[in-house]
């Protein structure tokens, strides 16, 4: 027998000892460190102690929490179980019921240990309110039960127990507040901060997007996460809905900013800029905004722009491919999870992926065992995942933010474009071509929008506040002398900075030649924002309810308004009348009458008319696109990002008028064939 046969025989003997060829050998690791997941699992089992073997009833769990305190209020043992119960009990038991059980236990305490047990219960309630002060403000029933508890303590308890309920810091909000915006260092009175998109550095833009993302992420509470897991929707959770809406708004903003440029080379420059922004977001470990920006760049309305992508450099195309693969949903976001596990320091997760994990954990196991006891291992696993997210909210961002640039981004993200509108503009920029085209530089989008459709419209009050904040920032940086006006050049640059209807709208009437006042800029941005955000032109009217004592007709539907039962609304500024149900459907812009209340113009100034915009065509650089606010009425308004000629004489360009081409039908397939 040679050495080779000897090795084969020895190998067969070894395999036979473990059950022959039919049974696979058990894979064992030798002299290797356990993975972080294994360490967390073991630590969780140790923290649960004997209860990890099964479950326990609500009374047993409550008793364990009470016995965690001594007479001085110190914890007798490790506080993991106590913190887990206080944070997770609402998943299986309402907080008001838990407080009622504590009140009952306090009232039933008798015997030699009565004072000690009551003192322990008071320490537990105080500890609960100090660690989770937000639950009192979000649950009126819990607030009522806690009030009865402290009233009982004040009536039946001793001085030591009453002192625990007298502290004024019981309901003080815990945790770090949102990061404070900081102005750029060295900002002098005469220095301007550029508020133009083309002038913003990619790193600066990424930092401000990270600030907005972190501020939105900090507002999410464990109660919001629980509500999402139990209901399967972000509706009813304003903070969580706002975070999802911010991500979707960033994605839409990226798409519209790319499509706002008339030529392929200009669109390629915007694409390249956002690719560098995405790379900077990756360096900042802001994966949630990175997902939004990359998703916008990989959207089919953008990926079909082959003429634009042809101008991208190979390095930019490669970088976009790498980011797309990093955030791809293949194998349950395996590449992102590996990257996230190796991150340290400041980082922001892809919220949708981690919420998906919470849902999976919740659905995988029941809340209670067959005998009715609570399933503690499940609650503990959920608690560990929630604590990871809560710990991330206590981070300190590595970058500061300029308040003026935040106002610019906030108003820019207050857009509300539908998928159909974005596709129509995409086809208007690069129509379908029957000739064969080179393949797209990257595949169909791999990055998915985890909560599609959650892009809430800004309400009138919020939008007005954002406009006022931006106007303040504009005049602070573009009018350092305090003259109260900005130049026409600055106005044109600012109006072209937004992806909503600015270029196609009639500019505000100027009181002085070549300058625009604060009121003119405010009214202009309000009018453009109202159209873009689908709030309607009624947003610009100041309606008040009136009773018409003489025959009047509605300016919206031409219906009759007369009598006590025919109350309607009249605009204080222009006198327009309409029904209550027609108020939000007004298609006439508010024209302030001379001498009317709130008129910003000089006395006797003529009211400027707004002629209907006429079409322009010619080269692809001047290709126009029209959006119908009311398709059935044919009311057409031009969008800002289309570079069309203006009806105002001073804004006319050298283009040849021709009929407007109808945009491609959106009923067909949205993917470029």
Swiss-Prot record:
Summary of the tissues where the protein is detected: Expressed by mast cells and their progenitors (at protein level). Specifically expressed in mononuclear leukocytes. Highly expressed in myeloid cells compared to lymphoid cells. Also detected in heart, skeletal muscle, spleen, liver, placenta and lung. Not detected in brain. Isoform 1 is the major isoform in normal individuals. Isoform 2 is more significantly expressed in a patient with asthma. Isoform 3 is more significantly expressed in a patient with asthma and a mastocytosis patient.
GO cellular component: cytoplasmic side of plasma membrane; cytosol; membrane; nucleoplasm; plasma membrane
Transmembrane regions: none
Function according to Swiss-Prot or TrEMBL: Functions as a cation- and diacylglycerol (DAG)-regulated nucleotide exchange factor activating Ras through the exchange of bound GDP for GTP. In neutrophils, participates in a phospholipase C-activating N-formyl peptide-activated GPCR (G protein-coupled receptor) signaling pathway by promoting Ras-mediated activation of PIK3CG/PI3Kgamma to promote neutrophil functional responses.
Annotated region (Disordered), positions in chain: 1-30, 160-187, 593-621, 639-673
GO molecular function: calcium ion binding; diacylglycerol binding; guanyl-nucleotide exchange factor activity; zinc ion binding
Subcellular location: Cytoplasm; Cell membrane
Sorted UniProt keywords: Calcium, Cell membrane, Cytoplasm, Differentiation, Guanine-nucleotide releasing factor, Lipid-binding, Membrane, Metal-binding, Zinc, Zinc-finger
SMART domains referenced in this protein's UniProt entry, alphabetically: C1 (SM00109), RasGEF (SM00147)
Residue stretches making up the EF-hand domain: 466-501
InterPro entries tied to this protein: C1-like_sf, DAG/PE-bd, EF_hand_dom, PE/DAG-bd, Ras-like_GEF, Ras-like_Gua-exchang_fac_N, Ras_GEF_dom_sf, RASGEF_cat_dom
PROSITE patterns found in the cross-reference section: EF_HAND_2, RASGEF_CAT, RASGEF_NTER, ZF_DAG_PE_1, ZF_DAG_PE_2
The keyword Disulfide bond belongs to this UniProt entry's keyword annotation: no
Similarity annotation: Belongs to the RASGRP family.
Domain Ras-GEF: 201-432
Comment on protein domains: The phorbol-ester/DAG-type zinc finger mediates the binding and the functional activation by DAG.
Gene name of the record: RASGRP4
Positions annotated as zinc finger (Phorbol-ester/DAG-type): 540-590
Protein name per UniProt: RAS guanyl-releasing protein 4
Signal peptide range: none
Pfam families attached to this UniProt entry: C1_1, RasGEF
GO biological process, one term: positive regulation of natural killer cell mediated immunity
Domain called N-terminal Ras-GEF: residue spans: 49-175
């Amino acid at each position: 027998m040679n050495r080779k046969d000897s090795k084969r025989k020895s190998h067969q003997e070894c395999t036979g000892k473990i059950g022959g060829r039919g049974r696979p050998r058990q894979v064992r690791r030798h002299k290797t460190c356990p993975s972080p997941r294994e360490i967390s699992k073991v630590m969780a089992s140790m923290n649960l102690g004997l209860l990890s073997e099964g479950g326990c009833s609500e009374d047993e769990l409550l008793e364990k929490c009470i016995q965690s305190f001594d007479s001085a209020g110190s914890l007798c043992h490790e506080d993991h179980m106590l913190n887990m119960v206080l944070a997770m009990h609402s998943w299986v038991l309402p907080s008001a019921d838990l407080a009622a059980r504590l009140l009952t236990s306090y009232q039933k305490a008798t015997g030699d240990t009565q004072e000690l047990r009551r003192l322990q219960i008071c320490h537990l309630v105080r500890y609960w309110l100090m660690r989770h002060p937000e639950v009192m403000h979000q649950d009126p029933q819990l607030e009522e039960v806690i009030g009865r508890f402290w009233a009982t303590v004040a009536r039946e308890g001793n001085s030591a127990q009453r002192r625990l309920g007298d502290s004024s810091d019981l309901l003080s909000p815990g945790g770090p507040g949102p990061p404070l915006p900081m102005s750029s260092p060295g900002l002098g009175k005469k220095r301007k901060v550029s508020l133009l998109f083309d002038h913003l550095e990619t790193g600066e833009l990424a930092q401000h997007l990270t600030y907005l993302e972190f501020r939105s992420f900090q507002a999410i509470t464990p109660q919001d996460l629980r509500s999402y897991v139990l209901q399967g929707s972000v509706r009813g959770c304003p903070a969580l809905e706002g975070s999802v809406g911010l991500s979707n708004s960033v994605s839409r903003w990226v798409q519209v900013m790319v499509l706002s440029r008339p030529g392929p080379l200009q669109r390629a420059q915007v694409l390249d800029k956002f690719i560098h922004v995405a790379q900077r977001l990756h360096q900042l470990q802001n994966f949630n905004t990175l997902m939004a920006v990359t998703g916008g760049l990989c959207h089919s309305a953008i990926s079909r722009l082959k003429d634009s992508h042809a101008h991208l450099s190979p390095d930019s195309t490669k970088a976009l491919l790498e980011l797309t693969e990093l955030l791809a949903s293949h194998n349950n976001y395996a590449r992102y999870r590996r990257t996230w596990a190796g991150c340290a320091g400041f980082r922001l997760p892809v919220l949708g992926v981690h919420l998906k994990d919470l849902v999976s954990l919740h659905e995988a196991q029941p809340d209670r065992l067959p005998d009715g006891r609570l399933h503690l291992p499940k609650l503990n696993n959920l608690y560990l995942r929630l604590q990871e997210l809560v710990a991330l909210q206590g981070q300190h961002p590595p970058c500061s933010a300029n308040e003026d640039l935040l106002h610019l981004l906030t108003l820019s993200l207050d857009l509300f474009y539908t998928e159909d509108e974005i596709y129509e503009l995409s086809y208007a920029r690069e129509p379908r071509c029957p000739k064969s085209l080179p393949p797209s530089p990257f595949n169909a989008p791999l990055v998915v929008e985890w909560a599609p459709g959650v892009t809430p419209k800004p309400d009138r009050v919020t939008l007005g506040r954002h406009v006022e904040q931006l106007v303040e920032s504009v005049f602070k940086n573009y009018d350092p002398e305090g003259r109260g006006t900005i130049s026409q050049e600055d106005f044109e640059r600012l109006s072209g900075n937004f992806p909503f209807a600015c270029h196609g709208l009639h500019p505000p009437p100027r009181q002085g030649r070549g300058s625009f006042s604060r009121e003119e800029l405010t009214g202009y941005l309000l009018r453009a924002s109202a159209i873009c955000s689908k709030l309607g032109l009624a947003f610009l009217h100041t309606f008040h309810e009136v009773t018409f004592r003489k025959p009047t007709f509605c300016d919206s539907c031409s219906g009759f308004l007369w009598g006590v039962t025919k109350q309607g609304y009249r605009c204080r500024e222009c006198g327009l009348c309409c029904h209550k149900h027609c108020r939000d459907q007004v298609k006439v812009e508010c024209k302030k009458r001379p001498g009317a209340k709130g008129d910003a113009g000089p006395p006797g100034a003529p009211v400027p008319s707004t002629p209907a915009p006429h079409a322009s065509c010619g080269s692809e650089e001047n290709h126009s696109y029209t959006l119908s606010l009311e398709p059935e009425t044919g009311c057409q308004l031009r969008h800002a990002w289309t570079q069309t000629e203006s009806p105002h004489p001073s804004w006319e360009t050298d283009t040849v008028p021709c009929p407007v081409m109808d945009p491609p039908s959106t009923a067909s397939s949205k993917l470029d064939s």
